[in-house]
């Protein structure tokens, strides 16, 4: 097996870095700073980060087929025009829950944008329970709710045959699997795939590799773990030099690099001194596996 190398490629510290997405056309990495209320784009060739500020906490960003990006921010699905930095609301959710905000999201293989909500954090990973839901934004901008009673809606991705949705509600400390109808975008038969061990931390963002295995970033666990959905077993752990790992995606010219976002929110001065690059973006190479290109929102 090739030797694994971990490096901090963006040392600017973000409060809650999240939602990394590789944009192949530009050769750049998109990500958000949730409470910093920014959409960011890092160019590996220049090592520079460009960012656009938005007016609400932003949980996730995705590519959009017609250009620009689609966002799950505040209680809205919105579109971002990167060139003029304008944001347009496409749909609203949870209007009866003013304390809720969107969190993680991802586009399914048919071009629908799924994202979930949670109540605003009292402090990191502490929320009013059962306030969140998982939603789909369809290309015609209609919205459907999959289920509610969620604590912190988080990582999601699809099996390589597109028949299974993998999903994380962080405070359940589990990775779940659901049957997924790719024709309709409906999900059913939710079940537990993997329960995290105590030392692994809180399951956060997630992505799938080209071998159909899941990679889960573990908040406060300082690691990404690889899970085999066939057996429900954890088969690999990659530890990072920071505790607050938040999400992961594959990228680079051939999708052989893994990018991991992190947070520094809630860390005291002593903790920050010990881990000064918390809130940075990390690149992991030498994993010996490649990822899958992200799908763009079709609407």
From Swiss-Prot:
Task: Show the SUPFAM superfamilies listed in the entry.
Answer: Calcium-dependent phosphotriesterase (SSF63829)
Annotated a divalent metal cation binding sites: 18, 154, 204
Question: What does UniProt note about where in the body, tissue by tissue, this protein is expressed?
Answer: Expressed in the liver, and in the pronephros from the late tadpole stage.
Q: Which UniProt keywords are listed? A: Ascorbate biosynthesis, Calcium, Cytoplasm, Hydrolase, Metal-binding
For this UniProt entry, what is the primary localization, expressed as one broad class? cytoplasm
Which InterPro entries does the record associate with it? 6-blade_b-propeller_TolB-like (IPR011042), Regucalcin (IPR008367), SGL (IPR013658), SMP-30 (IPR005511)
Q: Which Gene3D superfamilies match?
A: TolB, C-terminal domain
Q: Where is the active site?
A: 204 (proton donor/acceptor)
List the lineage, top down. Eukaryota, Metazoa, Chordata, Craniata, Vertebrata
GO-annotated molecular function: calcium ion binding; enzyme regulator activity; gluconolactonase activity; zinc ion binding
Q: Which gene encodes it?
A: rgn
Q: Which pathway does it serve?
A: Cofactor biosynthesis; L-ascorbate biosynthesis via UDP-alpha-D-glucuronate pathway; L-ascorbate from UDP-alpha-D-glucuronate: step 3/4
Species per Swiss-Prot/TrEMBL record: Xenopus laevis
- The entry's protein name is Regucalcin
């Amino acid at each position: 097996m090739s030797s694994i190398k971990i490096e901090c490629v963006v040392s600017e510290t973000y409060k809650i870095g999240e939602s990394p997405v590789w944009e192949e056309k530009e050769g750049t990495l998109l990500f958000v700073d949730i409470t910093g209320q920014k959409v960011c784009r890092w160019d590996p060739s220049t090592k520079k980060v460009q960012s656009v500020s938005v007016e609400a906490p932003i949980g996730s960003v995705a590519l959009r087929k017609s250009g620009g990006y689609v966002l799950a921010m505040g209680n809205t699905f919105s579109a971002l025009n990167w060139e003029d930095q304008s944001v347009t609301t496409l749909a609203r959710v949870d209007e009866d829950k003013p304390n809720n905000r969107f969190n993680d999201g991802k586009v399914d293989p048919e071009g629908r944008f799924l994202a979930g909500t949670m109540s605003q954090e009292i402090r990191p990973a502490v929320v009013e329970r059962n306030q969140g839901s998982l939603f789909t934004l369809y290309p015609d901008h209609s919205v459907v709710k999959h289920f509610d009673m969620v604590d912190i809606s988080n990582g999601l991705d699809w099996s390589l045959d597109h028949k299974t949705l993998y999903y994380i509600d962080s405070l359940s400390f589990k990775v779940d699997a659901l049957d997924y109808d790719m024709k309709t975008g409906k999900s059913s038969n939710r079940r537990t795939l993997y329960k995290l061990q105590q030392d692994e931390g809180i399951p956060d963002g997630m992505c799938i590799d080209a071998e159909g295995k899941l990679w889960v970033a573990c908040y406060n666990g300082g690691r990404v773990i690889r899970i085999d959905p066939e057996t429900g077993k954890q088969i690999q752990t990659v530890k990072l030099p920071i505790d607050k790992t938040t999400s992961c995606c594959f990228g680079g010219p051939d999708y052989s690099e893994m990018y991991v976002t992190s947070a520094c929110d809630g860390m005291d001065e002593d903790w920050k001194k010990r881990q000064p690059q918390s809130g940075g973006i990390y690149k992991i190479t030498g994993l010996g596996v490649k990822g899958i290109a992200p799908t763009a929102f079709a609407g």
